[in-house]
């Protein structure tokens, strides 16, 4: 069964496990503004990692500030997207935040949306454009996203996809790169092929594949309000069964005065 870790009245979102699974980095609003925190995976007191006064509790059109994206493979830093570029608060840049506390440092990539480190930490797969929070479907305009790789050792970028549709939320599992695309009009998970067209590995028709997140062996994503796990080794997708235990006071019967509803 699922176990609740946070209970603050504000939002806690974008959780990411550390490489060894012992910690969780996430965004939260404990002190009014959205900041990045880290806590033990089994639960406990969160530690605040960032202190910059963000753009406010209501997100800009480009998305939430301080979005946690990944950890460095050595577990020493948390990769976050922060909205503080001089040419617009809608635009975000990747920063590395020490997991034990310290000054955040901007990465070489000038602007980006979703992104993730390669398993060896030498590259980042990312989208230069951030549009994950827009609600337009089947968008084919100038800000449709494509997937790129940035080589951190050589400070060089390479474009992987070039399609009028949206290609976003890229993740890395072993040697394979997966991303969400609506090139067939519903967002599904695709595998990048260096020598050919990307291959769809899920076939959802009713709802979009949203927020894919990867670990060493699998990709987990949301679809139609449910969580699914895709295993690249076997090419299988299965819906996760999540049980939330609790007293659920909102479901308990209670007496109310119904006089105003009687005519």
What are these regions (language model features)?
Residues 1, 6-12, 25-37, 41, ...:
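A flexible loop/linker signature enriched in serine peptidases of the S9 family
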Residues 134-136, 215-216, 263:
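Generic recognition of flexible, low-complexity loop/linker segments
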Residues 110-111, 173-175, 194-196, 216-217:
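Short glycine/proline-enriched coil/turn segments at helix->beta-strand junctions
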Residues 237-263:
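Non-catalytic accessory segments flanking enzyme active sites
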Residues 43-44, 101-102, 155, 195-197, ...:
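Short coil/turn linkers that define WD40 beta-propeller blade boundaries
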Residues 64-66, 216, 255-257:
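Short, surface-exposed amphipathic charged segments that create phosphate/polyanion-binding patches used
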Residues 18, 72, 118, 256-261:
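Structural signature of eukaryotic scaffold interfaces centered on beta-propeller domains
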Residues 19-20, 73-74, 119-120, 172-174, ...:
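Residue-level detector of Asp-centered blade-edge/turn motifs that repeat once per structural unit
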